[in-house]
């Protein structure tokens, strides 16, 4: 029976690896944490056909049997200027699976700063409790605030859904002003859930119109030549002085 060698350069539990092995008796699954191709045993590159990795990207000449690279990340900007990208090896991403995790992070940051948690933690570290607590810790609610989500893919949609649950107004920035196409991949538990669509849609040429209306701005754009320096000095100056920028791109 022909086998298929699968290598993971990220650390997964034995339970998860055994679940992968159970897919087919042909799979030979090997794992070693590595951030570069040089950190893996040389003999592995002669065998590997499927690679799961974050940044350990071999030259295809070094891995003659390699057919498929599954990236741990949603973006591939760090792959595009490599021999691997220019080869016939298939490269796929994890776009879509991070939506709940990253959206919760965004809401956590918005809540932390609106509720003055950094100030509270600083006082705690100094073992002090200010007498003017109201002036120091009074917090605006997320409810009725406006959040602008730049990049309305799977993560942006989930940010919008959670923001709506907090009673926020959601502005979405995407390439076209239509209703938008569904993400190429969406977790089954998120698909079709209400509240994901923004209250208003802006295209990139209307960025200067959207930013002044936002109390919070979420930067969820992929890193591409078109988005490089998309948020520049002019964009920052267009924002409210009190606005919070959360960058998860």
Question: Language-model segments: what does each one mean?
Answer:
Residues 1-50, 179-181:
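N-terminal glycine-/charge-rich "phosphate-binding" loop or analogous flexible N-terminal tail
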Residues 177-249:
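Rossmann-like adenosine-cofactor binding region
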Residues 3, 88, 143-146, 242:
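Phosphate-coordination loops involved in phosphoryl transfer and adenosine-cofactor binding
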